[in-house]
Amino acid sequence: MANTLHYSPQALKDLDEIFDYIFTDKQNPIAARNTIEGIKNSIAELKTLDNIGVKVRLPGDLETPYRFIQYNNYLTFYRQIEKDVYIDRIIYGKRDYIKLLFG
């Protein structure tokens, strides 16, 4: 049985902001579309693959409930509880994601 994906409102906002930034600021509508499509395709893998990606740890090697997968420069942070996968954030990889997630 496949996992069910649940996007948080913030994750959906992140996707919109990524698209808008590439489309408007970088003036590249094709790259904007391709980037969002690539991120969504990488997230779709979570339907069939359990707990893939890297575990997120805090300083001091403290565990968190998060894992992340990467598409190009973007990191998708998610939690998996049984067959439910919660997509919480999609963040540019060079940002301080610890602060954004736990800040």
Task: Describe each region flagged by the PLM.
Residues 44-70:
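A short, surface-exposed loop/turn module that caps and links secondary-structure elements
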Residues 10, 39-45, 69-77:
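A short, hydrophobic secondary-structure junction motif
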Residues 71-103:
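Enriched for short, Lys/Arg-rich terminal
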Residues 2, 53-55, 59, 63, ...:
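Generic secondary-structure boundary/loop-capping signal
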Residues 41-52, 83-85, 93-96:
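Short, charged/polar surface micro-motifs in flexible loops or helix N-caps
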